[in-house]
Amino acid sequence: MSLDKGTKEEITKKFQLHEKDTGSADVQIAILTEHITELKEHLKRSPKDQNSRLALLKLVGQRRKLLEYLNSTDTERYKNLIARLNLRK
């Protein structure tokens, strides 16, 4: 269920703040969102896969914490990122 290197690089290029940015909250949230989307699709096909369900809950929690951090440090970037990723908040 992990993302391949090419997908991560595409997401990083799309959401990075500067040329060498690979770990900002924006990039991490975007990668987690893509991973969550893939896990949701997997769980639609395999509803009894409890390990994947737990992994999904863990990833959602990580993303929520990063979103809270971004909202507390830079509200404008937070709102922009929410709009770009089509997340509810």
Swiss-Prot record:
Keyword annotations: Ribonucleoprotein, Ribosomal protein, RNA-binding, rRNA-binding
Highest taxon above the source species: Bacteria
Stated role: One of the primary rRNA binding proteins, it binds directly to 16S rRNA where it helps nucleate assembly of the platform of the 30S subunit by binding and bridging several RNA helices of the 16S rRNA.
PANTHER family found in the cross-reference section: RIBOSOMAL PROTEIN S15, BACTERIAL AND ORGANELLAR (PTHR23321), SMALL RIBOSOMAL SUBUNIT PROTEIN US15M (PTHR23321:SF26)
HAMAP family with a match to the protein in the record: Ribosomal_uS15_B
Family statement: Belongs to the universal ribosomal protein uS15 family.
Assembly behavior: Part of the 30S ribosomal subunit. Forms a bridge to the 50S subunit in the 70S ribosome, contacting the 23S rRNA.
Name of the protein in its database record: Small ribosomal subunit protein uS15
Gene transcribed to yield this protein: rpsO
